[in-house]
């Protein structure tokens, strides 16, 4: 395949074995943040779920008490043993498509949106990493909390090559698993369909199910997309994002990328984190999860299920 781009650190293309083995608006100074010693992470004993709640008007619902929530595993109610509506520190991964079809204004608008997201819309307590991808994913920088080098790294990108979305997600998930913060989210920005991955969506699904990260996609679906790219597949992106509790947002103009990333940041800034003790801990099996608000008109997005870690699992 033609084309490479110069960045400091490279990641080999994701492969099926990897995938199968892996299974905000700007923050105000008054925003409460959960202290770093509060560990809100899943373990063999406790399953932790992050949830986004919207009211009947579609607005983010904030300030709901624990008593307003109900949780179910495999259709059976479970008692909520951990709960916070305060902002829990976030580990964010960002995947930026730099295939040939992103040339020109698209890549410039995308770079500006990414830079604003990372430098202005995250909290000082958050950490982030960025991968760029065409027919293979490349790590621009690993986990960091400071803005140093972000602008320069993005500015060196040059769109070329084809699009390997599944490989990029497969390469990002291990970083999310080793995140230095409690919550996890992955944001994908792309203007095309996958044309070059070594793995398939089928190969990627086990890794997505095992991950507790909210996955978001911003699909650039501009009129008259160049013939060099297959049109972005919104249904495929939605299949990837929806099961995680995330979503896919479509923009018709790259000038709207900043609004789209701000909407995602706003969600990440107003989430609930809930935990419960599974009735069947450590069995290594898949279990469905449902989170609901007992009051009328509220809609909850959370991951659809999880694979329980075995008690002898060393991960």
Give the ranges of each region predicted by the language model.
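Scaffold/interface architecture of coatomer-like assemblies
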Residues: 27-315
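N-terminal secretory signal peptides that target proteins for export/translocation
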Residues: 1-11
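Bacterial N-terminal signal peptides
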Residues: 12-28
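Compositionally biased regions
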Residues: 3, 16-17, 29, 43
């Amino acid at each position: 395949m033609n084309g490479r781009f110069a960045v400091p650190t490279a990641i080999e293309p994701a492969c099926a074995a990897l995938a199968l083995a892996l299974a905000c608006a700007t923050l105000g100074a008054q925003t409460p943040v959960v202290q770093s010693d509060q560990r809100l992470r899943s373990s063999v004993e406790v399953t932790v779920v992050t949830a986004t709640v919207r009211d009947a008007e579609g607005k983010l619902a904030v300030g709901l008490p624990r008593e307003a929530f109900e949780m179910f595993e495999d259709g059976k109610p479970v008692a909520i043993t951990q709960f916070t509506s305060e902002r829990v520190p976030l580990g964010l991964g960002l995947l930026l498509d730099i295939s040939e079809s992103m040339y020109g204004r698209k890549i410039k608008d995308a770079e500006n949106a990414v830079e604003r997201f990372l430098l202005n819309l995250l909290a000082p307590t958050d950490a982030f990493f960025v991968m760029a991808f065409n027919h293979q994913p490349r790590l621009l920088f690993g986990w960091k909390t400071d803005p140093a080098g972000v602008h320069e790294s993005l500015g060196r990108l040059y769109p070329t090559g084809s699009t390997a979305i599944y490989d990029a997600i497969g390469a990002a998930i291990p970083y999310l698993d080793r995140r230095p913060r409690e919550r996890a989210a992955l944001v994908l920005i792309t203007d095309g369909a996958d044309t070059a991955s070594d793995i398939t969506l089928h190969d990627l699904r086990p890794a997505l199910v095992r991950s507790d990260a909210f996955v978001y996609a911003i699909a650039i679906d501009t009129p008259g997309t160049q013939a060099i790219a297959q049109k972005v597949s919104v249904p495929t992106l939605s299949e990837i994002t929806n099961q995680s509790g995330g979503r896919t947002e479509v923009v018709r103009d790259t000038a709207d990328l900043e609004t789209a990333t701000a909407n995602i940041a706003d969600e990440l800034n107003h989430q609930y984190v809930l935990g419960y003790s599974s009735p069947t801990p450590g069995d290594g099996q898949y279990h469905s999860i449902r989170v609901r608000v007992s009051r009328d008109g509220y809609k909850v997005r959370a991951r659809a299920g999880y694979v329980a870690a075995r008690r002898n699992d060393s991960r």
